[in-house]
Amino acid sequence: MVTALSLLTACGGNPKTTAEAEKIDYTVEQFADLQILRYRVPGFEDLSLKQKELVYYLTEAALQGRDILFDQNGKYNLTIRRMLEAVYTGYKGDKNTPDFKAMEVYLKRVWFSNGIHHHYGSEKFVPGFTPEFFRQAVQSVDAATLPLAEGQTVNNCARKCSPLFSTPR
């Protein structure tokens, strides 16, 4: 993704006026100790179709590299991320509860840091939701969306993964 952004920023294009640049809200989201920012990419709309296609494929390659990075950062990072994503998208309970909101923040931290450890300090994230909530939430989603090993049950997977991110070490 960094490569794709570098290519886009090198495109040039018509510079925007200061007033136009100030109209954009650069902060997309803020949670925990993180802030997600958006950037204007001047000239993107002026790229040829071939250049936009290149940007697309570079972005797809970056997404595949992200999974490799997750896997290299911790043995169970990819499994945990996929379980959390399955709950985030398929949870059938109340998404306004403090446990679900805490799980959402935890997932976003996992996305940002490519795993269950802080991207700078390397300390393990402590989730704000209970292991009971996690097990119940995992059981509420479609099993086909979970990263189950061959022959593994939903209960077994939830029981195996819960201590991996809910214990301090």
Where are these regions (language model features)?
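N-terminal helix-rich structural modules
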Residues: 22-169
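Sec-dependent signal peptide recognition
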Residues: 1-2
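N- or domain-start disorder-to-order transition segments that initiate the globular core
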Residues: 17-20
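C-terminal motif of bacterial Sec signal peptides marking the signal peptidase cleavage site
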Residues: 6-10
